[in-house]
């Protein structure tokens, strides 16, 4: 008789683990999407600056005479 009760408990534990895994994966996907959006915004800002005045943008990164 005890074996009859073990199987449903094992299935329930497996289902809970699957649910936890699915929740973790969904959270990771959301975080990944958020990071991609932030990166896209940064790249858009750089592209906009280069379209406006590329020379000034590049010169802001160039050292001048011993700086």
UniProtKB/Swiss-Prot annotation:
Instruction: Indicate yes or no for the key word Cytoplasm.
Output: no
Sequence position, cross-link Isoglutamyl lysine isopeptide (Glu-Lys) (interchain with K-? in acceptor proteins)? 67
Recorded metabolic or biological pathway in which this protein acts: Protein degradation; proteasomal Pup-dependent pathway
The record's annotation in InterPro entries points to: Ubiquitin-like_Pup
- Share an example GO biological-process annotation for this protein: protein pupylation
Q: What is known of its domains?
A: The N-terminal unstructured half of Pup provides a signal required to initiate unfolding and degradation by the proteasome but is not needed for pupylation, while the C-terminal helical half of Pup interacts with ARC to target proteins to the proteasome.
Instruction: Kindly give the HAMAP family that the UniProt entry links to this protein.
Output: Pup
Annotated protein name in UniProt: Prokaryotic ubiquitin-like protein Pup
Organism encoding this protein: Bifidobacterium longum (strain NCC 2705)
